[in-house]
Regions:
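Extracellular adhesion/carbohydrate-binding repeat motifs centered on closely spaced tryptophans
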Residues: 2-546
Length: 546
């Protein structure tokens, strides 16, 4: 009996020793979706519900509210943008949604109205003067809350509902929200006002017609007593200062005096209503519109413009021309052009666009007529007082979607001209536009093809909000994750809670809560594998080279 007891004691001691050799293993929950009663949650690795965040299931995104449950049938703000989730909790994309009190119980978005949510789920809304948005080829207007606008709309995006809303309005939208574009509008409400151009009361008008051009803006006179002239479907029409078509108009005010602020001599000059291409005064500026027999093109644009005569009294045509210390652009019949102007060389006018005719995406994608085969210049939009060529690297231009920075060489040509990405002073430009990171992300990725279209060789650079290229090795906070840079190149992105760390010539996932091994998550991205465009998250892609 005594011997047996001794053997049992040794067995107990041996078992205790073995237990000391086995390391303690911390148990973690499996991250993922969890059903709680009739509702869904998303549990993290600590088995806690994720709150106030988007999570993906297959191809759909879902939002978890402050309680950690799916939000349903609700419009809400997240990260400075508006989103809508349907009755199943899915984020709605590329769709119209009528938002009423049921979908907006707190009344954060004003009166009931239609809203549109794009491919990224973000609701379209006005940002500064950028309230005009295109959806499936049709233009619409939205206010700062994302509500679709209808009726008469001002240049600032305000709906006008006074007695004569057409006076200060620039746009018009029907009940379906579509802005009138290249389209006539018949106004049958009448008015007691008087036209400054014709001196006639609108009560004398049999009908009141308005026309809205390709940019959805109402045609109107900007030259005091002179009508605004346009060829529409082969016929020439005149419009007064309020945009009303002048039905009986032929030509108004044959000769008058005007003073040009800059540039000009101290002498007063004249503008003529019927210039026929003959000799003018020498080396002078003229404010006028051309006569019907000046140009062979029957679809020409007949509006008042500045013209310049040379030393022989001939109108300057189809060239960029120096006057004093400044340069100006003139089209094929001699009209001075302002805004964005395209020339093939310096002696072949191609096209002109108002600065607010396009948004940044059009310059990035090259979706502007003539921009691939012509040189882009910028001439001051202040037609009455300047109009000269603009050069420099920090020129702020008010585009349709807000202010953006452009740069032009001393010659006046845009950096990144003819739709070719250009690196200049540690920044990238395309068609003059500086490529800046999205404001909400802080950093973005620009891909550049240093090879050919048949044999591309891509380089991936990271830029900040001011377009500066990030050099060296960096871990950068971008949106809800981290953007990784090595040797001045983008090498990966991860949405970890903790910032990745550099170790053994690679970026590793880092988990500060894992005390046994902070680097258990392994390498974020194998840098021996070539980077490809599909590894750049859409929200971080600033420019994608062909």
């Amino acid at each position: 009996m005594r011997r047996k007891t001794k053997q049992g004691l040794w067995a107990v001691l041996l078992a205790a020793a073995v237990a000391c050799l086995v390391p303690t293993v911390t148990a973690y929950a499996i991250e993922g979706w969890n059903r709680e009663g009739d509702e869904w949650q998303y549990l993290n690795r600590e088995d806690q519900p994720v709150t106030n965040a988007f999570k993906k299931s297959k191809d759909d995104w879902f939002y978890l509210d402050e309680r950690g449950f799916l939000l349903k049938n609700r419009i809400f703000s997240f990260g400075g943008d508006d989103f809508y989730v349907d009755q199943d909790g899915r984020m709605v994309r590329n769709a119209w949604v009528f938002i009423d009190s049921e979908k907006d119980p707190d009344g954060n978005y004003g009166d009931s109205a239609w809203h549109y949510f794009g491919a990224d789920g973000k609701g379209l809304r006005a940002k500064g003067k950028g309230f005009r948005k295109e959806i499936d080829g049709q233009a619409y207007a939205f206010d700062e809350n994302g509500r679709m606008l209808t009726g008469w709309i001002s240049d600032e995006g305000a709906v006008l509902e006074d007695e004569d809303p057409f006076v200060n309005a620039r746009y018009y939208a029907d009940a379906d929200g579509a802005l009138y574009t290249n389209r006539w509008l018949y106004y049958d409400w009448g008015s007691h006002l008087t036209s400054e151009v014709t001196g006639r009361s609108y009560e004398d008008y049999e009908k009141m017609w308005f026309y809205f051009g390709a940019d959805s803006k109402k045609y109107r006179s900007r030259a005091g007593e002179q009508p605004f002239q346009r060829d529409i479907d082969g016929q020439t029409y005149g419009f007064d200062e309020k945009g009303v078509m002048i039905e009986w108009w032929d030509k108004v005010a044959s000769i008058s005096d005007a003073v040009r602020s800059n540039p000009t001599s101290d002498e007063r000059v004249r503008y003529y209503s019927g210039y026929d291409g003959g000799a003018l005064m020498k080396s002078k500026w003229f404010w006028m519109y051309p006569s019907a027999n000046l140009d062979e093109d029957q679809n020409r644009d007949l509006e008042c413009s500045w013209w310049r005569s040379d030393a022989k009294g001939r109108a300057i045509r189809n060239k960029i021309y120096r006057v004093g210390e400044k340069e100006y652009a003139f089209d094929g019949i001699g009209r001075m052009k302002t805004g964005f102007v395209l020339f093939d060389g310096r002696h072949e006018f191609v096209a002109q666009y108002d600065v607010d005719a396009w948004d940044a995406a059009h310059f990035i994608n090259g979706d502007i007529y003539g921009i691939e085969k012509a040189d882009l210049y910028l001439f001051s939009p202040d037609e009455l007082n300047d109009g000269s060529m603009q050069t420099g690297k920090e020129i702020t231009v008010e585009l349709a979607d807000g202010p953006r920075t452009f740069a032009f060489a001393p010659s006046g040509k845009a950096y990144g001209n003819r739709n070719i990405l250009q690196k200049k002073d540690n920044k990238f430009y395309i068609n003059g536009l500086r490529l800046d990171a999205p404001e909400e992300q802080g950093y973005g990725v620009v891909s550049q093809n240093i090879g050919t279209l048949d044999a591309p060789q891509y380089r991936f650079y990271v830029v900040d909000r001011n377009g500066r290229i990030v050099n060296g090795r960096r871990v950068l906070r971008a949106g809800d994750g981290y953007l990784l840079v090595a040797n001045g190149q983008y090498v990966g992105y991860c949405g970890d809670e903790d910032a990745p760390r550099w170790k053994n010539d690679a970026f590793y996932h880092y988990d500060r809560s894992n005390r046994q091994n902070h680097y258990a998550g392994g390498v974020v991205e194998d840098m021996r594998t070539p980077m490809t465009k599909d590894k750049v998250p859409d929200e971080l892609s600033v420019f994608e080279a062909d």
